[in-house]
Amino acid sequence: MPEGLIVKALSGFYYVQSEGALIQCRGRGVFRKRKQTPLVGDYVEFEAENETDGYVMAIKERKNQLNRPPIANVDQAILVFSAKEPDFHTLLLDRFLVHIEQHDIKPVLIISKTDLLEASERDALTRQVAMYEQIGYPVLYTSTKQADDPSELLPLLANQVSVIAGQSGVGKSSLLNALAPEAKIETNEISRHLGRGRHTTRHTELLPIGEGLVADTPGFSSLEFTDMEAEDLRFCFPEFLSLMDDCKFRGCLHDKEPKCAIKDAVETGEVDSFRYKHYLQFLHEIQDQKRRY
């Protein structure tokens, strides 16, 4: 049975790329019975009715799956955050990073609109972002003048399935247009009254860009931690990993426990205090959710 990759899902149809051809497929009824939904990024077996139409028959095992946006088998996430308009937001960035780390997806940070900053603002931003670089996250800086030049990003996309995410109004669609001008992704100017943009993408699609595939998605519509356990959160902060074995108590949540290596590292500056503050905020949010349900 032929195999292929779902590169687009729209109105109940799944568009499967296979050996240079694009086959418009419907899902088998058995998927509904199993409460299974084929996703963009799925490797599938399909049965062709003719050269252009067919049915998805089976879904290959996924290495990961995001629900909002609905996509599978993602290698890396390009997280776009602006230096200004809207302002750089570390709490929101850390929310994104936790969700990405939870699914074993490699993050790449892009800080856009850096030319809109005054010198003092640029110094403050550089200090904040340096901490993410020290953790090991790759970081690229771009300006509004560089918006049409994706040359620095292209090598990072090779042989990867990438998803672009970030705060509304930071230039995600503009970045995709620079990467794939033929795609003509719809963009919206930021609303100065609201201080944010609007998501413009309506469906999920994988675009061939450079030597890789980049997902044009409707964006992350939910950043809540509904599917995460409190004890799993710590593994989504890479700077904790080498220290956790030094905590006195096995299973330490690095909150109220005594002789905690993470809290000691915050005191010495080895772990950044605002990252730890965000960790505690997320931890208490997860614990409160579990108590409610």
Swiss-Prot record:
<dbReference type="GO" id="GO:0003924">
    <property type="term" value="F:GTPase activity"/>
</dbReference>
<keyword id="KW-0342">GTP-binding</keyword>
<dbReference type="GO" id="GO:0046872">
    <property type="term" value="F:metal ion binding"/>
</dbReference>
<comment type="function">
    <text>One of several proteins that assist in the late maturation steps of the functional core of the 30S ribosomal subunit. Helps release RbfA from mature subunits. May play a role in the assembly of ribosomal proteins into the subunit. Circularly permuted GTPase that catalyzes slow GTP hydrolysis, GTPase activity is stimulated by the 30S ribosomal subunit.</text>
</comment>
<dbReference type="InterPro" id="IPR004881">
    <property type="entry name" value="Ribosome_biogen_GTPase_RsgA"/>
</dbReference>
<dbReference type="GO" id="GO:0019843">
    <property type="term" value="F:rRNA binding"/>
</dbReference>
<feature type="domain" description="CP-type G">
    <location>
        <begin position="63"/>
        <end position="223"/>
    </location>
</feature>
<feature type="binding site">
    <location>
        <position position="254"/>
    </location>
    <ligand>
        <name>Zn(2+)</name>
    </ligand>
</feature>
<feature type="binding site">
    <location>
        <begin position="112"/>
        <end position="115"/>
    </location>
    <ligand>
        <name>GTP</name>
    </ligand>
</feature>
<keyword id="KW-0479">Metal-binding</keyword>
<dbReference type="InterPro" id="IPR030378">
    <property type="entry name" value="G_CP_dom"/>
</dbReference>
<dbReference type="Pfam" id="PF16745">
    <property type="entry name" value="RsgA_N"/>
</dbReference>
<dbReference type="InterPro" id="IPR027417">
    <property type="entry name" value="P-loop_NTPase"/>
</dbReference>
<keyword id="KW-0963">Cytoplasm</keyword>
<feature type="binding site">
    <location>
        <position position="252"/>
    </location>
    <ligand>
        <name>Zn(2+)</name>
    </ligand>
</feature>
<keyword id="KW-0694">RNA-binding</keyword>
<feature type="binding site">
    <location>
        <begin position="166"/>
        <end position="174"/>
    </location>
    <ligand>
        <name>GTP</name>
    </ligand>
</feature>
<feature type="binding site">
    <location>
        <position position="260"/>
    </location>
    <ligand>
        <name>Zn(2+)</name>
    </ligand>
</feature>
<dbReference type="GO" id="GO:0042274">
    <property type="term" value="P:ribosomal small subunit biogenesis"/>
</dbReference>
<keyword id="KW-0862">Zinc</keyword>
<dbReference type="InterPro" id="IPR031944">
    <property type="entry name" value="RsgA_N"/>
</dbReference>
<protein>
    <recommendedName>
        <fullName>Small ribosomal subunit biogenesis GTPase RsgA</fullName>
        <ecNumber>3.6.1.-</ecNumber>
    </recommendedName>
</protein>
<comment type="similarity">
    <text>Belongs to the TRAFAC class YlqF/YawG GTPase family. RsgA subfamily.</text>
</comment>
<dbReference type="GO" id="GO:0005737">
    <property type="term" value="C:cytoplasm"/>
</dbReference>
<dbReference type="InterPro" id="IPR012340">
    <property type="entry name" value="NA-bd_OB-fold"/>
</dbReference>
<keyword id="KW-0690">Ribosome biogenesis</keyword>
<dbReference type="InterPro" id="IPR010914">
    <property type="entry name" value="RsgA_GTPase_dom"/>
</dbReference>
<keyword id="KW-0378">Hydrolase</keyword>
<dbReference type="GO" id="GO:0005525">
    <property type="term" value="F:GTP binding"/>
</dbReference>
<feature type="binding site">
    <location>
        <position position="247"/>
    </location>
    <ligand>
        <name>Zn(2+)</name>
    </ligand>
</feature>
<keyword id="KW-0547">Nucleotide-binding</keyword>
<comment type="subunit">
    <text>Monomer. Associates with 30S ribosomal subunit, binds 16S rRNA.</text>
</comment>
<dbReference type="Pfam" id="PF03193">
    <property type="entry name" value="RsgA_GTPase"/>
</dbReference>
<keyword id="KW-0699">rRNA-binding</keyword>
